[in-house]
Swiss-Prot record:
Similarity remark: Belongs to the RNA polymerase alpha chain family.
Keywords: DNA-directed RNA polymerase, Nucleotidyltransferase, Transcription, Transferase
NCBIfam families according to UniProt: PRK05182.1-2 (NF003513), PRK05182.2-5 (NF003519), rpoA (TIGR02027)
Keyword Glycoprotein appears in the UniProt entry: no
CDD domains recorded: RNAP_alpha_NTD (cd06928)
Classification via InterPro entries: DNA-dir_RNA_pol_insert, DNA-dir_RNA_pol_RpoA/D/Rpb3, DNA-dir_RpoA, RBP11-like, RNAP_asu_C, RNApol_insert_sf
Protein name: DNA-directed RNA polymerase subunit alpha
Gene that encodes the chain: rpoA
Gene Ontology molecular-function annotations: DNA binding; DNA-directed RNA polymerase activity; protein dimerization activity
Reported function: DNA-dependent RNA polymerase catalyzes the transcription of DNA into RNA using the four ribonucleoside triphosphates as substrates.
Entries under Pfam families matching the protein: RNA_pol_A_bac, RNA_pol_A_CTD, RNA_pol_L
GO biological process: DNA-templated transcription
Amino acid sequence: MQGSVTEFLKPRLVDIEQVSSTHAKVTLEPLERGFGHTLGNALRRILLSSMPGCAVTEVEIDGVLHEYSTKEGVQEDILEILLNLKGLAVRVQGKDEVILTLNKSGIGPVTAADIIHDGDVEIVKPQHLICHLTDENASISMRIKVQRGRGYVPASARIHTEEDERPIGRLLVDACYSPVERIAYNVEAARVEQRTDLDKLVIEMETNGTIDPEEAIRRAATILAEQLEAFVDLRDVRQPEVKEEKPEFDPILLRPVDDLELTVRSANCLKAEAIHYIGDLVQRTEVELLKTPNLGKKSLTEIKDVLASRGLSLGMRLENWPPASIADE
């Protein structure tokens, strides 16, 4: 076997043994030592928890208010009926949610074949048992909501979010969206030329019939590859820190002197000296203001007190005053 000692072997799909339409064995080899468990466990977890599918999520049965009741003429109690509906295998094309109906009367079993649906829905196992009617006059009618989802979502996880709008008699069902019912993998020894320390991965799985086992493994591998893409092109994706530009001047300095609500005498004196903004005022000294005509010590004291209440004072130095926004006016 030629190649670098650091070069990894690439596995190939050796065999697909179709035991039945819902049961298959898939064999991959050769794998580097340890990679049988690495890939087998990853694929197993994805197949059990992350495969999309359709499942019954809500049921309404005529004359039934809650799941802890029974229905006259029906052999099973409501909990058992819900459990049977939970195992219903449905394939839906092009929709995320459909409503199915079932109406049956007379003695005999009620199966998935009795469900009324449109052309977008396929009942994979029509013989799936739902309940038994035990009386000629007995009947059962129900509305079944089927939704598309992923993994497993218990009814308890949806109770709080739907409680306010869910009417009495609408029964929630644990939603098992995953089409994979059972999966196991086994790692066996494999050999390539002189190497005898390699792995062979054998995956055995059963589905509910809504997906072909080979297609299920293909989807699981695609999900795994997509999740690992970020690591292939690993780089620092941290966003550069955006520094907020601090204003050059305190906004209060850009406000007009009128906002200080000075007396009319003091305000007129400042305007006569072309002091229009608070920034203009704080740069003046007491001596400069006292030289202003008609502005005495009383007005000066008023100005100082008003500025102090805003954390300002006379005689302040402001670099680059006035700002462009004021200078252009």
